[in-house]
Amino acid sequence: MEPAQQPPPQPAPQGPAPPSVSPAGTPAAPPAPPAGHQVVHVRGDSETDLEALFNAVMNPKTANVPQTVPMRLRKLPDSFFKPPEPKSHSRQASTDAGTAGALTPQHVRAHSSPASLQLGAVSPGTLTASGVVSGPAAAPAAQHLRQSSFEIPDDVPLPAGWEMAKTSSGQRYFLNHNDQTTTWQDPRKAMLSQLNVPAPASPAVPQTLMNSASGPLPDGWEQAMTQDGEVYYINHKNKTTSWLDPRLDPRFAMNQRITQSAPVKQPPPLAPQSPQGGVLGGGSSNQQQQIQLQQLQMEKERLRLKQQELFRQAIRNINPSTANAPKCQELALRSQLPTLEQDGGTPNAVSSPGMSQELRTMTTNSSDPFLNSGTYHSRDESTDSGLSMSSYSIPRTPDDFLNSVDEMDTGDTISQSTLPSQQSRFPDYLEALPGTNVDLGTLEGDAMNIEGEELMPSLQEALSSEILDVESVLAATKLDKESFLTWL
């Protein structure tokens, strides 16, 4: 017999191996992927599964919800199914109103007016149930109806016909053999509350009698009561009413303390006088004040006249040949500016009434009143920026080109020696005047009015070609340390 021929070996499949089938016919779990590889599962029924989830939520009746175990069949303790017993009788649930069944809470209407608060609140007193403070002399005050929040001890005797017993859990209850009932409420609390009930109150007494320590009302005040029993006060002096007790006013209390502590001094008897003398004597204080006021006004007038005299002397010292009438008036107006501020804008005899309003306006603006304002003086535009004698301009002409003032041809012969002499004629106090800046150039004669057209030819003759050549000046080669130009 020939040996059986072996079948040729099958080549290894190139694709993934099919899942093995178990003997039961169910596919086995796929093998684990090798390390570093991920397996992505693609399911075609994902949309169907999502719809099923939404349907289970939207339509719970039609959804196949698995049956849960009933609560009774679960292993829960017995206390889970028993409701808690009422704890109104226990210490944890005790309230202040333990005798709610016997006595209902009674709230007394409190007075909304401040008049119910008497001065007895400051002094030792007690607080009644109605909220009114009464003094020591008042009737016995009623205590609060609040009950104790703790259990009454067992040694306190019970009322007749009552008996206390305890349940199996140790809770106390009470037996009433009179009517054969049981209750959780302690009858001893009702007894204590009945003892605290005040006696029937007497008819309403006016609060003035109730609090005798408050003292009498101030002069001109009266106490009254409305139909509801609320107290108010009438002030006959100014014919007003108020809820507030005037005796509670701190000003009245202070005055009352002062009058009580300080001894009362009788006024000295007045000497017999005639009817006219009596009227004058009554207003002596007013007369003294008027006399002092008149003295102050007279002193102020004397100072004003003295100041005017000083200014007139200063005007007389000015040379009449160089100071004409309009400029004297200008100086007088300048000198009167401080006086106008002190006197409230009253013009002096030197100035006219028509000028006072404009001077007052210019003074309040805190500027020079003679700069481009009014018809009294107008400063012309200056073209000699470096040669003006005004204190408002800054000379910028180099000193090298103005060696001496004599070289300028101004057309008018001006002596250099006359300028210092004229400046020396002005008093020094003119420079110290507040709010003014006396321009000496405006106070000189007409000879000092140097026109710019006459000054320009002399400047053009003195200027060199280098200073007029801007390009050569701005060149870097022309600038050195010895240059007369200073760049800022």
From Swiss-Prot:
Tissue distribution: Isoforms lacking the transactivation domain seen in striatal neurons (at protein level). Ubiquitous. Isoform 2 is expressed at higher levels in the neural tissues. In the embryo, it is expressed in brain, eye, and the maxillary and frontonasal components of the primary palate.
Residue span(s) of domain WW: 156-189, 215-248
Disulfide bond entries: none
Coiled-coil residues: 71-85, 283-344
PTM notes: Phosphorylated by LATS1 and LATS2; leading to cytoplasmic translocation and inactivation. Phosphorylated by ABL1; leading to YAP1 stabilization, enhanced interaction with TP73 and recruitment onto proapoptotic genes; in response to DNA damage. Phosphorylation at Ser-385 and Ser-388 by CK1 is triggered by previous phosphorylation at Ser-382 by LATS proteins and leads to YAP1 ubiquitination by SCF(beta-TRCP) E3 ubiquitin ligase and subsequent degradation.
GO cellular component, one term: cell-cell junction
ATP-binding is among the record's keywords: no
PTM annotation (Phosphoserine): residues: 46, 90, 94, 112-113, 116, 123, 149, 274, 352, 356, 366-367, 373, 382, 385, 388
Pro residues bias (residue ranges): 1-21
Listed Gene3D superfamilies: 2.20.70.10, 6.20.430.10
PTM annotation (Phosphothreonine): residues: T48, T95, T104, T397
Pfam families linked to this entry: TEADIR3, WW
InterPro entries assigned to the protein according to its UniProt record, in alphabetical order: TEADIR3_omega_loop, WW_dom, WW_dom_sf, YAP1
Major site of localization recorded for this protein: cytoplasm
The protein's assembly and partners: Part of a complex when phosphorylated that contains DSG3, PKP1, YAP1 and YWHAG; the complex is required for localization of DSG3 and YAP1 to the cell membrane in keratinocytes. Binds to the SH3 domain of the YES kinase. Binds to WBP1 and WBP2. Binds, in vitro, through the WW1 domain, to neural isoforms of ENAH that contain the PPSY motif. The phosphorylated form interacts with YWHAB. Interacts (via WW domains) with LATS1 (via PPxY motif 2). Interacts with LATS2. Interacts (via WW domain 1) with isoform JM-A of ERBB4 (via PPxY motif 2). Interacts with TEAD1, TEAD2 and TEAD3.
Similarity-based family: Belongs to the YAP1 family.
Entry domain remark: The first coiled-coil region mediates most of the interaction with TEAD transcription factors.
Protein name: Transcriptional coactivator YAP1
Organism expressing this protein natively: Mus musculus
Gene transcribed to yield this protein: Yap1
